[in-house]
């Protein structure tokens, strides 16, 4: 039997989207493993999904992630520069969605 895993997608998603993203990707027949991780900029908890799949299912997996991982507006408080008092100013930032890396798989074994 030929190896069905030819592509590894590494998708970084927000914790809030983890369950929906996992179900969505599993629904197309892909194998999913997740690792807890944290973002560097905001330090928020997120998850890195390791998704193994045949190369021809890459588009389906990306569509599944796009449907289940949504972007959100959150506010980060930063001190006002030049202010005599350190008053925080809320700054809107866009977070969420998914950051996806695609890697070819030369060899895959289940032991």
Each model region followed by its residue ranges:
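Positively charged, small/polar-rich N-terminal and surface patches that mediate targeting and assembly
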Residues: 1-111
